[in-house]
């Protein structure tokens, strides 16, 4: 097999890159370890920045998102008996976010890829990357017991935190930055109307809570829990009781409860690896960085990586400017670190940390009061929440 760009991973970042490249006439093949149903079964993020919405539109996969996505012009933070709304649209110069589940984004991209006849190899086992620093890299993998080879010009590693792509870079070439948080999020998905038409983030003495949504009829709620908690110890009733205890009384009264479709506990971490490229291999999304979900940045950072890599590959193929690809990591990391900072900050001011003393607790409350009581502070949160601009590729 031969292609121009080999893409490892058929999650949203790999599929989005493949769709953009296909529209530009650049041949690509995606290799995915799992089945399509497994990929679609992952319950993930649902808040899309303006930049990602624009990129999906550019890729021609925005029809269902435009119809079913919920445009949010604000977000609310509750703390110390107060509720503060952040007017995202006004404070960011007209930008908004769109609530549209990652599963739906993935389904739209899968259907678009199938419709255009581009190649995706599912259940590709034992994937290995070779000759990354040479001019002719290639990928080997097994399918139905047969060992196959895929020759290519470039490889995009879009296979997530545990994927083979980052592992294919010599460890001594990479610098790892990491922070693991001492709690997780217990999330519940239910076919109940959302308690609010905008997201509510709550800082409460019992711990953080978030009221989110996937659609006008499907809600997603989270509560902060210790890492020692097990999801099987949480009945639906226990979850709803705990969630109500952490929300403002008037919100808790309106909360519609119901049976859970899914419950899971996700640990929180911040993680960045530098550089994000090695020879002709380029890492994108979770393969290179993880953010705690508090800032809704994980999927959106993957999209900005994909946008950067796509535009650099266009320059390489259309203008013969392959040397620009050497800038990929530096361009991506400038935006990534700002999103990492925002996600860390949101996590720090909204969660209750074990062993926090009275002074630190009062500082946390004052930090929220200052930012949410100041036009400049509100604008800073809004600018980051809707997403910082993508860097232009000259």
Swiss-Prot record:
Outcome, altering residue 33 to K: Slight decrease of affinity for p-OHB and NADPH
A UniProt-annotated Pfam family: FAD_binding_3
Effect of residue 162 to Y: No significant changes in affinity for p-OHB are observed. However, the affinity for NADPH decreases slightly
Binding site for FAD: 13, 32, 42-47, 102, 286, 299-300
Keywords (A to Z) from UniProt: Aromatic hydrocarbons catabolism, FAD, Flavoprotein, Monooxygenase, NADP, Oxidoreductase
Catalytic activity: 4-hydroxybenzoate + NADPH + O2 + H(+) = 3,4-dihydroxybenzoate + NADP(+) + H2O
Outcome following mutation: residue 269 to S: No significant changes in affinity for p-OHB are observed. However, the affinity for NADPH decreases slightly
Variant or mutagenesis effect after changing residue 162 to N: No significant changes in affinity for p-OHB are observed. However, the affinity for NADPH decreases strongly
Protein EC: 1.14.13.2
Outcome of mutating residue 269 to D: No significant changes in affinity for p-OHB are observed. However, the affinity for NADPH decreases strongly
Documented effect of changing residue 162 to T: No significant changes in affinity for p-OHB are observed. However, the affinity for NADPH decreases strongly
Self-association state and partner proteins as the record states: Homodimer.
Protein name listed in UniProt: p-hydroxybenzoate hydroxylase
Source organism (scientific name): Pseudomonas fluorescens
Name of the coding gene: pobA
């Amino acid at each position: 097999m031969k292609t121009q760009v080999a893409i490892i991973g058929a999650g949203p970042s790999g599929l989005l890159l493949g769709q953009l490249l296909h529209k530009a006439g650049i041949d690509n093949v995606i290799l995915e370890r799992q089945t399509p149903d497994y990929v679609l079964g992952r319950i993930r993020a649902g808040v899309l920045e303006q930049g990602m919405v624009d990129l999906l539109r550019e890729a021609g996969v925005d029809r269902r998102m435009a119809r079913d996505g919920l445009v949010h012009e604000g977000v609310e933070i509750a703390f110390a008996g107060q509720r503060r709304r952040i007017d995202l649209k006004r404070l960011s110069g007209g930008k908004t976010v769109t609530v549209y589940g990652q599963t739906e984004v993935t389904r739209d991209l899968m259907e678009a890829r199938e419709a255009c006849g581009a190649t995706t190899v599912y259940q590709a086992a034992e994937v290995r990357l070779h000759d990354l620093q040479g001019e002719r890299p290639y990928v080997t993998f097994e399918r139905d017991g047969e060992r196959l080879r895929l020759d290519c010009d470039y490889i995009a590693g879009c296979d997530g935190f545990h994927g083979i792509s980052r592992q294919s870079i010599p460890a001594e070439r990479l610098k790892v930055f990491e922070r693991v948080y001492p709690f997780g999020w217990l999330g519940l998905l239910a076919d109940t109307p959302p308690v609010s038409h905008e997201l509510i983030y709550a800082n409460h003495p019992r711990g953080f809570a978030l009221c989110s949504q996937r659609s006008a009829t499907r809600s997603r709620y989270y509560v902060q829990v210790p890492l020692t908690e097990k999801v099987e110890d949480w009945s639906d009733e226990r979850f709803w009781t705990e969630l109500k205890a952490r929300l403002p009384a008037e919100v808790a009264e309106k909360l519609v409860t119901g049976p859970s479709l899914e419950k899971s506990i996700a640990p929180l971490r911040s993680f960045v690896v530098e550089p994000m490229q090695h020879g002709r291999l380029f890492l994108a999304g979770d393969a290179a960085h993880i953010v705690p979900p508090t800032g809704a940045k994980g999927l959106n950072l993957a999209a900005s990586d994909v946008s950067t890599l796509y535009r650099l590959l266009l320059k390489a193929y259309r203008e013969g400017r392959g040397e620009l690809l050497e800038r990929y990591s530096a361009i991506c990391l400038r935006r990534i670190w700002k999103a990492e900072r925002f996600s860390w900050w949101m996590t720090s001011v909204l969660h209750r940390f074990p062993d926090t003393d009275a002074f630190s607790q009062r500082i946390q409350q004052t930090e929220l009061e200052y930012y949410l009581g100041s036009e400049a502070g509100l604008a800073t949160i809004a600018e980051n929440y809707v997403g910082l601009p993508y860097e232009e590729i000259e």
